[in-house]
Amino acid sequence: MDAIKKKMQAMKVDRENAQDLAEQMEQKLKDTETAKAKLEEDFNDLQKKLTTTENNFDVANEQLQEANTKLENSDKQITQLESDVGALQRRLQLLEEDFERSEEKLATTTEKLEEASKAADESERNRKVLEGRSNTAEERIDVLEKQLETAKNVATDADQKFDEAARKLAITEVDLERAETRLEAADAKVHELEEELTVVGANIKTLQVQNDQASQREDSYEETIRDLSKNLKDAETRATEAERQLTKLQKEVDRLEDELLAEKERYKAISDELDQTFAEIAGY
């Protein structure tokens, strides 16, 4: 009888221990399931971050391609502007050469005009001298008449020369006006070209600034891509580690569930044995 009581007490202790162990196992299982849920949540967050990182990488890559396209367009514009500047400089040189030729022609025309004016003045002085002599010497009328006729002829020639000089002067004045007009047009064109060169220079400086900014943005994009690539690699590493931890926890959960099932079976066996013992005691 004492042996039965001891056995019952031992079985009772085993049952209590088994019950405590089962409760501990259930609590451990709950904790494990909580950790598993937390890991699954972290894993989902990592997947979301990974997706966001991939999207940011794609956006940065597109921005980098756009920056490269803009940089190529800027280089083409700079090349075209440099070509335009060269053409404008050649045109300016041609205009300067035309202006120099106009000045030379104007100087030549002015010199010829001065010579014609001197010849006309000389003829006029000769005519006046002849007229004075005809008034003071009547005995020399015949001679003077001849001289006068000669003087008239000279005067006529002088008038013709004067008319020719006047005509040439008029032509020269027209040429001078045309030269002045061309000079003014050349000055205006030079001023216009200088303004165009100023604008082109400003545009070139602007394009150079844009080119520098594009280079800076390109460096920034490359750095961003490197950072995103590193973040992507880190996220992939964390995701792999999370999957490994999740697999490990799943195995631990399976093991604990197996142990819990074994403890429940053991507890059931102890309970059945106690029930059988109580039945045997009741039979006595």
From Swiss-Prot:
Q: What does this protein do?
A: Tropomyosin, in association with the troponin complex, plays a central role in the calcium dependent regulation of muscle contraction.
Its organism's taxonomic lineage begins at: Eukaryota, Metazoa, Spiralia, Lophotrochozoa, Mollusca
The answer to whether the entry has keyword Aminoacyl-tRNA synthetase is no
User: Quaternary form?
Assistant: Homodimer.
Lineage, top-rank taxon, reads Eukaryota
Name of the molecule in the record: Tropomyosin
By sequence similarity, the record places it as follows: Belongs to the tropomyosin family.
Q: Which organism is it from?
A: Chlamys nipponensis akazara (Akazara scallop)
Task: Write out the entry's keywords from A to Z.
Answer: Coiled coil, Repeat
Which Pfam families does this UniProt record tie to the protein?
A: Tropomyosin (PF00261)
Q: Give the span(s) annotated as Disordered.
A: 103-133
Stretches assigned to coiled coil: 1-284
- Read off the domain note: The molecule is in a coiled coil structure that is formed by 2 polypeptide chains. The sequence exhibits a prominent seven-residues periodicity.
Gene3D superfamilies cross-referenced by the UniProt entry: 1.20.5.170, 1.20.5.340
